[in-house]
Amino acid sequence: MASKKIRTRFAPSPTGYMHVGNLRTALYAYLIAKHEAGDFILRIEDTDQERLVDGAVDIIYNTLKLTGLNHDEGPDVGGNVGPYVQSERKAIYLEYAKNLVEKGEAYYCFCSKDRLDMLKENAEALKRPFKYDKHCLHLTKEEIEANLAKGLPYVIRQNNPTTGSTTFDDVIYGKITVDNSELEDMILIKSDGLPTYNFANVVDDHLMGITHIVRGNEYLSSSPKYNRLYEAFGWDIPVYVHCPPIMKDTHNKLSKRNGDASFEDLMKKGYLKDAVLNYIALLGWNPGTNEEIFNLEELTQKFDFKDISKSPAIFDDAKLKWMNGEYIRKLSLDEFHELAVPEYKKVLKKDFDLKFISELLHTRCELLSDLAEQIDFLEELPEYSTDLYVHKKMKSTVESSLENLQKVLPIIEEIDEANWNKDYIHEKVFELIKSLEIKNGQMLWPIRTALSGKSFTPGGAFELAILLGKEESISRLKKGIELLK
């Protein structure tokens, strides 16, 4: 018998920005499908109407498009098993919930908010988790019909057993058994007629033919209840792939509620989309080699969901920044320059050779948003301490710096504008270094410091002189001499 075509889904709630954890779920679902030439479906889960955020659906579309995680079916591209927006499927869920009621697998609950609040307070007083007491399970058919006729608000709850156990399999975590006494009678249909997330995703996953479900391990505890729904309907249970949490550090989960970076934030900080996607792929998955740089096509070929780890993944900003630098260096100079110019223009108003700046920074840049800070001294010399002139490796001191700047200044002043180029300046300065019988760094470090007022610069002394021009270079050398006196 031929195996079923792999079908995965990304089913986000449009409640704001695309969080890193959500993007990883989308990526893993995409890779599982595409590794086996399957289908990747986008479904919008908007049943929690109070949490919806205007524009959030567009963020989902834009992020998937930008990262290349193109879906085969979805609200914007259509498909054979739509609608792909849960709020447009309201009648479907109610029909299936009523079917469960008829089977005795679910029941109407008319309990008031006051009664439910009382149950919660009692549970808190006893320091036990809240669990509905099945009060409405025992209503007769006549009582239920009378309540419905009166128009009393109701929810439909799952009827879970209180004895025995339920076992389910997860690709990552293995076989898990839960005592049925721990299962709550979760709400399937809310009082507004919309399904809960828990119910809608089971119905939709079945009707849309989803074979593999990728989600965070926080849903492990709900999986026995999902399984009981599948079994109650007589449906095949899909393959579960529960992913480990992404941690900010060893104690705290990465969370959009705590203001941790969303995909949009990372883009604004100057990260490249391909670097972010590559890094996120490695948050919980290991290719089994030391190789770490993969484009989306390479990830699709190599990804095996069975290699996803149980262990929490730490979101390491330094590692992401390193990886981003690797991707920046893979860009052509023209590609890098195009991305860098908007950053330069944030701080540079005067006329500079921007392409030359890009040539200097291309191999040194790790983050586009760092560029402005690395070149702002070109526009205006910052105030700086004479401590910058002290450099042990360069054998440079405050005293030697003053002496060497005073000796190089007339050499610089004598260079004609026509000869103001790197090779000629280099030749003249090195003639002086040779005649003084000093180390190169003893001359070059103070020149660089005087021209920039910074410990890090995009180029050395000669590159800075070319960028600044003769007049500005001489002015800054004189300021350095005055500061050192």
UniProtKB/Swiss-Prot annotation:
Its cofactor is Zn(2+). It is an enzyme of class 6 (ligase). Keywords: Aminoacyl-tRNA synthetase, ATP-binding, Cytoplasm, Ligase, Metal-binding, Nucleotide-binding, Protein biosynthesis, Zinc. Its main location: cytoplasm. Binds 1 zinc ion per subunit. A motif ('HIGH' region) lies at residues 12-22. The keyword Protein biosynthesis applies. Zn(2+) binds at residues 109, 111, 136, 138. One of its GO terms (molecular function) is zinc ion binding. ATP binds at residue 256. A motif ('KMSKS' region) lies at residues 253-257. One of its GO terms (cellular component) is cytoplasm. Its EC number is 6.1.1.17. It comes from the Bacteria. GO terms for biological process: glutamyl-tRNA aminoacylation. The keyword RNA-binding does not apply. It is found in: Cytoplasm. It catalyses: tRNA(Glu) + L-glutamate + ATP = L-glutamyl-tRNA(Glu) + AMP + diphosphate. Belongs to the class-I aminoacyl-tRNA synthetase family. Glutamate--tRNA ligase type 1 subfamily. Catalyzes the attachment of glutamate to tRNA(Glu) in a two-step reaction: glutamate is first activated by ATP to form Glu-AMP and then transferred to the acceptor end of tRNA(Glu). Monomer. PANTHER family: GLUTAMATE--TRNA LIGASE, GLUTAMATE--TRNA LIGASE, MITOCHONDRIAL-RELATED. This is Glutamate--tRNA ligase. It comes from Clostridium botulinum (strain Alaska E43 / Type E3). The lineage of its organism: Bacteria, Bacillati, Bacillota, Clostridia, Eubacteriales. The gene is gltX.
